[in-house]
Design a protein with these regions (language model features):
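N-terminus-centered regions that define maturation/targeting leaders and the start
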Residues: 2-6, 16-203
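Twin-arginine (Tat) signal peptide motif
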Residues: 10-11
């Protein structure tokens, strides 16, 4: 009888071990995620962190013309060559300054830069009558002049782009900085940007 009881005990132990092993195998298969459509913690971890899909853009406008419309003659070489008035909104809170580049991508010899302004205060909302706030400065344009030069296409209708950049820090540039250095610094790592485009035809 004693031997019979030992045999029975061993049988129960074997069944118990098989039950535990089966449970472990089922748990392992369920946690692998293969073909699973659940949305538990394992699925969330695999998805990774959520990142913004795009950076907010700055809205640029001019009281002188609408986006895609003709730029008035008075702002060109055929007029008084007055700097075009601009306004903008949407500069992010973390910006330390604002920069502006006006250029013509249709110029015969490649993009021609008409105007470069940098280190405008982050709180600035535009440029009116060409007046720059304290601290702001101009870099050289395509003519080598640290000033505005208006639209003056040799032939046809050209696009003139006014791009505003929100900068993470004040740029280490001097007034009258060379054009290539200024463009590189402005475009290096802006927080956001926005653009207004106008048209001007040769006379």
């Amino acid at each position: 009888m004693k031997a019979h009881h030992c045999s029975l005990g061993r049988g129960r132990a074997t069944v118990g071990a098989l039950t535990v092993l089966t449970a472990l195998l089922l748990a392992a298969c369920g946690g692998s995620g293969g073909g699973s459509t659940g949305s538990g913690p394992a699925a969330s971890t695999a998805a990774g962190p959520v990142t913004p899909s795009s950076v907010a853009t700055i809205t640029v406008r001019s009281p002188a013309f609408a986006a895609g419309a003709a730029i008035p003659v008075r702002f060109s070489c055929r007029g008084s060559n007055t700097p075009i008035p601009l306004t903008w909104t949407g500069v992010p809170a973390g910006a330390a300054g604002v920069a502006l580049i006006m250029d013509d991508p249709d110029a015969p010899s490649g993009t021609f830069t008409h105007w470069v302004v940098f280190n405008l205060p982050a709180t600035s909302r535009g440029i009116v009558n060409g007046r720059l706030p304290a601290g702001a400065a101009q870099a050289q344009n395509g003519r080598g002049q640290a000033s505005y030069t208006g639209p003056c296409p040799p032939s046809g209708t050209h696009h003139y782009r006014f791009t505003v950049y929100a900068e993470p820090e004040q740029l280490s540039l001097q007034a009258g900085a060379p054009l290539t250095a200024a463009l590189a610094a402005i475009k290096a790592s802006p927080l956001s940007s926005g653009r207004l485009t106008g048209l001007f035809a040769s006379g």
